[in-house]
Swiss-Prot record:
One of its GO terms (biological process) is glycine decarboxylation via glycine cleavage system. It comes from Variovorax paradoxus (strain S110). The glycine cleavage system is composed of four proteins: P, T, L and H. Keywords: Oxidoreductase, Pyridoxal phosphate. This is Glycine dehydrogenase (decarboxylating). NCBIfam families: gcvP (TIGR00461), PRK00451.1 (NF001696), PRK04366.1 (NF003346). Belongs to the GcvP family.
Amino acid sequence: MPIPALPSLQQLENAEEFLARHIGIDAADEARMLPVIGSETRAELIDGIVPAAIRRAKPMRLPAPATEADALAELKAIAAKNKVFRSFIGQGYYGTHTPGVILRNVLENPAWYTAYTPYQAEISQGRMEALLNFQTMVCDLTGMAIANASMLDEATAAAEAMTLAKRSVKSKSNVFLVSGDCHPQTIEVIKTRAAPLGIEVKVSTVSETLPHLMVSGEFFGVLAQYPATTGHVHDLRPLAGHAHQCDAAFCVAADLLALTLLAPPGEWDADIVCGTTQRFGMPMCNGGPHAAYLACRDEFKRSLPGRLVGVSVDTHGQPAYRLALQTREQHIRREKATSNICTAQVLPAVVASMYAVYHGPDGLTRIAQRVAALTAILAQGLAQMGREPVNGTAFDSLTIRTGDDTPKIIERAQAAGVNLRQRLQQHLGISLDETTTRADIETLWALFVPAGTPMPRFDDLANAVPRLPEDLRRTSAFLTHPVFNTHKSETAMLRYIRSLSDKDLALDRSMIPLGSCTMKLNATSEMIPITWPEFANIHPFAPAEQLVGYAQLDAQLRAWLCEATGYAGISLQPNAGSQGEYAGLLAIRSFHEANGQGHRNICLIPSSAHGTNPASAQMVGLQVVVTACDAQGNVDMDDLRRACEKHSDKLAAVMITYPSTHGVFETRVKELCELVHEHGGRVYVDGANMNALVGVAAPGEFGGDVSHLNLHKTFCIPHGGGGPGVGPVCVVEDLVPYLPGHATAGVASNGVGAVSAAPLGNAAVLPISWMYCRMMGAKGLQAATEIAILSANYISARLKDHYPTLYASPNGHVAHECILDLRPLKDSSGVTAEDVAKRLIDYGFHAPTLSFPVPGTLMVEPTESEPLAELDRFIDAMIAIRGEIRRVEEGVWPKDDNPLKHAPHTAASLMAAEWPHPYSRELGAFPLAELKLAKYWPPIGRVDNVYGDRNLFCSCVPVGDYKETEEA
């Protein structure tokens, strides 16, 4: 018998090892799946699905795949090029200590970071409780009535505050006043947002102060910083009163840590309060991700943008959390939505809320008092040296007039590894934080001490009085709910975090087959680098020479993404897909204006589009015209042609999703692009479904002008329960000059300002996508696309006799997702798509996308990461559910009393003394025998959505409510 040949060293090194870790289907699985679909090979399948006219002419040019160990080592070398200085820049970004129990058990825990946005309330109670804690924390600290469940960053939250004010007040003015004492990046983002909406932004200056600007009364809103970016604590109460006399809204960008000591804006009649929670446990991360917040008066709540967690009851009368007032949002109201915000910053919001739970009101107050005390000591020492701070009041920040000494002090600071705030004429700024030490104060004094002047002695100044105005001191209590006063030991905190994560269903438990969401593997090796100090402890406005590693990461990732999409340029600044859409449409609008075509203001959008598309279009001042889809779910080309001809002179853009939101590759997409170009418009190809394109087709090659990507879909950044995300905007050559700039960071653009607070957006999660691309290589990325398509078609084929696929190509194939049509079942059995979604919970699954893009359907996207066993488990569950529906159709079970109508089944409901249903308790709990081995138990029954909106309650539930329901 011949001895088998030994593998070569190259084979043993196995550079492509990660492909098999990321892709759940192997060659043997393929051999089983392909005959079910009716194809002999994967190549044959792809050739029959992806139109030949759009296939890539050449493979992607990317580095060969690296092993996990090699990729981590390579990225570590890049990270080492960043210089981690002690940053006292402030400007909205501060050092913080992330408690280890939160770092390990939330930020680095897949039970938290792999979860999806909590649309399915019954399997999201844990993170919604954490988000309700977040909302309560914000309301308590700001003194406002209601707060949402996070915004993208402080600057975009301020821009949303501006538009919220515009929608909510009586004033008909188009002028928005902004204090020059606001953070400069906030002012820039506000100006970017205001311009296409016809809002005039007036910024106060030294000579033209905010009170002076307010004299005319011609404005609809005002924004002030509290404390100011210079550190001064202004008394804003008179200005708030004057704004109300003018029928305008008074908005405040407030520091939450400072509000533990300062009178909250809600107590002096502010209307809207926004800001960031970054310093509540999230590192600076070169600008993100961090959870911003937005709070307002109760009467503004129906115009409040973003997610809002509210309290309702389940079918058993128990308190239950849910997303409230969703009719405000883009997925329902489309171009009439309050905002295009979709993905926000849930994971950082959970970190911030846990930080508040862990420290409690006393701990937060102590941290704030220590910061204020150190600031007073620093200020008094500087005054002794003749460097009296300009701001007589302060919480954590000082502005020092340095005149001609400025360059010398900066040079000394750099030599000492210290960053000071430099963008103040003849002045330098210093901001302290939770991490500041006695040694830091002494180092700072040494930088400013004039020659021959003795250094102050720290101990002599230890009793310096904080520089807070007496009449603005906080006297009201906050965070009084027991949740903020119970979990003080690490043991208690650990168990609280675990108790919440146990209530939820995330990717660490099962497949999440959500269509249009691409819930793929977030590999551990991809996640590890995000908390490296070289990435996490970098200030976004540090000097460029300290950001060399980030610059290399940025350049490489942009190059790889351009290669994947076929575009010429890309910006990574947008910190969500919604912001990428906004930036892309802004580029189109700016291009038309620069070319004397500013009158082009019509945006054509197919009726099947995601709600962010029309919401984003209206944000840049475009008028949305909806075009039809045909019976097969494709863009109706005849209707589109009529619309193009009708609006030819005004056509700015057409927005499409490709493959379509209906889950098919439309064969006439190149023709569509050519038609739009003939009429002077540009083609926006929504990148939501890029997981079906990478390696096989590129939007920039088949006619797209602009696309945004969702790195939290296609390129492995986790969804985090609803954020963070990254939405890079990709453009063709002539639109590159109109990508977002960032004047605050010295990044120029052709009149297009910043769309995010930080120049690199959610910079700290970019290493995740870098690692994914580096380990997969061109071959792996294309294989991922092809397997995603294979898996979707396998599910569609196996379920076709039970649930017809609504849309497919002429040969019966789908793209990377399929829409299962459940509408006929409602007539035959009374069972709805929602009933099936809830029953899937009993089988241990997160439901597919419910009733989008077609009401009464389920859209399934398995991704390439799921193994065949999990696909089969899902298919078996769906077939078993169809069997249950058949028993209703046959009259075995009543239409209103069956396992689907009462799903999901909680352990408590199954153990009730009485069981009045015509099916067994066992069937309710264990519809398949295998579930007896491992079972996810939903913590609540089905949520009453109507009750929740009629009885809106958006802060922590009084403990008594739980006791009452238990006694009942």
